[in-house]
Amino acid sequence: MSEAAETLDGWYSLHLFYAVDWATFRLVPEDEREAMINEFKTFINDKASAREQQAGDYALYNITGQKADILLWYLRPEMKELNEIENELNKLRIADFFIQTYSYVSVIELGNYLAGKSDEDPYQNPHVRARLYPELPRTEYICFYPMDKRRNETYNWYMLPMEERKKLMYNHGMIGRQYAGKIKQFITGSVGFDDFEWGVTLFSDDVLQFKKIVYEMRFDETTARYGEFGGFYIGHILKTDDFEHFFAI
């Protein structure tokens, strides 16, 4: 049997994608719409306090295209806290006009393929902790996609020897390093949590960088032979100060 790679796990993660039922929302009297928007804004701002307390974070983006209108991404120390956030959100009046189009449940993950042997507790390493319990960027653009490692009769990632997987992941990682300073990447593990094995969330102020890195990765053996992908979601940052404009109808 092949050796399983160890992982380091951080905050639990929930990506929520919603379409807005604009046709029905338009029928709501203006004063009621305004009250709903303010209630939603209060909800977002209340949950944002976790960032200052270093007990989680969030991202809010307006998704481009017909897959969704809004992405809310929450990170929390406990999975049950994500349930509480989602339940509270669903009970807001404005949620009656939100149609959930997709969601993704996972946990911030660092692969341990390239880690050397050490007696150090990695969870006490400041660099590691900053990646497991991150403060999310507030860049102009976001990209999210789920992915699997292929396992079929011809190419099965999980049957490769550990040393070969280490080599492939090293080469894969070297491509990503070329985008340091241009893209901030977060990998979340979802084996046993959702329909894919990982979620990939990218942040950048230049949306074209998403296309460049994904295209370049296509020529990497790890991706070309063993990568399988779900849908891609691209969005522009949505600030609570812009809610009035966003929800104006």
UniProtKB/Swiss-Prot annotation:
<comment type="function">
    <text>Involved in coproporphyrin-dependent heme b biosynthesis. Catalyzes the decarboxylation of Fe-coproporphyrin III (coproheme) to heme b (protoheme IX), the last step of the pathway. The reaction occurs in a stepwise manner with a three-propionate intermediate.</text>
</comment>
<dbReference type="GO" id="GO:0016634">
    <property type="term" value="F:oxidoreductase activity, acting on the CH-CH group of donors, oxygen as acceptor"/>
</dbReference>
<dbReference type="GO" id="GO:0004601">
    <property type="term" value="F:peroxidase activity"/>
</dbReference>
<dbReference type="InterPro" id="IPR031332">
    <property type="entry name" value="CHDC"/>
</dbReference>
<feature type="binding site">
    <location>
        <begin position="145"/>
        <end position="149"/>
    </location>
    <ligand>
        <name>Fe-coproporphyrin III</name>
    </ligand>
</feature>
<feature type="active site">
    <location>
        <position position="145"/>
    </location>
</feature>
<dbReference type="GO" id="GO:0020037">
    <property type="term" value="F:heme binding"/>
</dbReference>
<keyword id="KW-0479">Metal-binding</keyword>
<dbReference type="Pfam" id="PF06778">
    <property type="entry name" value="Chlor_dismutase"/>
</dbReference>
<keyword id="KW-0350">Heme biosynthesis</keyword>
<dbReference type="InterPro" id="IPR011008">
    <property type="entry name" value="Dimeric_a/b-barrel"/>
</dbReference>
<dbReference type="GO" id="GO:0046872">
    <property type="term" value="F:metal ion binding"/>
</dbReference>
<feature type="binding site">
    <location>
        <position position="185"/>
    </location>
    <ligand>
        <name>Fe-coproporphyrin III</name>
    </ligand>
</feature>
<dbReference type="InterPro" id="IPR010644">
    <property type="entry name" value="ChdC/CLD"/>
</dbReference>
<dbReference type="GO" id="GO:0006785">
    <property type="term" value="P:heme B biosynthetic process"/>
</dbReference>
<feature type="binding site" description="axial binding residue">
    <location>
        <position position="172"/>
    </location>
    <ligand>
        <name>Fe-coproporphyrin III</name>
    </ligand>
</feature>
<keyword id="KW-0349">Heme</keyword>
<feature type="binding site">
    <location>
        <position position="131"/>
    </location>
    <ligand>
        <name>Fe-coproporphyrin III</name>
    </ligand>
</feature>
<keyword id="KW-0408">Iron</keyword>
<comment type="pathway">
    <text>Porphyrin-containing compound metabolism; protoheme biosynthesis.</text>
</comment>
<keyword id="KW-0560">Oxidoreductase</keyword>
<comment type="similarity">
    <text>Belongs to the ChdC family. Type 1 subfamily.</text>
</comment>
<protein>
    <recommendedName>
        <fullName>Coproheme decarboxylase</fullName>
        <ecNumber>1.3.98.5</ecNumber>
    </recommendedName>
</protein>
